[in-house]
Amino acid sequence: MHEMSLCEGILQILEEEARRQMFSRVRTVRLEVGELAGVELDAMYFGFDVVCRDTLADGARLEIVQRPGQAFCLGCGERVAVRRRFDACPDCGSYQLQVIGGDELRIKDLEVD
């Protein structure tokens, strides 16, 4: 379950930003998670709750905005939607796809005190 280590990394960022921006409590964390990022959302919610116990983010709400996967097809030159890595191009059937979106994991914004 790599989601736990992802949550630990998020907490580290929160702690660094709290020192830098002088806030003491995190109320909400909004993440953007790409459909191709390989993140299990239920595990992410669980891991976030566990990792944040007894920290500045204890009880914080995690909101996840999922971004669709996108790729550029080298076969037909089209930008296409993909749900999984290594899918074929839905337009021409080629497997020569270059992912151009939907593989990100980033903190979009925070609500803090």
Curated annotation (Swiss-Prot):
GO terms for molecular function: nickel cation binding; zinc ion binding. Ni(2+) binds at H2. Pfam families: HypA. The keyword Zinc applies. One of its GO terms (biological process) is protein modification process. Keywords: Metal-binding, Nickel, Zinc. InterPro entries: HypA/HybF. Belongs to the HypA/HybF family. PANTHER family: HYDROGENASE MATURATION FACTOR HYPA (PTHR34535:SF3). Involved in the maturation of [NiFe] hydrogenases. Required for nickel insertion into the metal center of the hydrogenase. NCBIfam families: hypA. This is Hydrogenase maturation factor HypA.
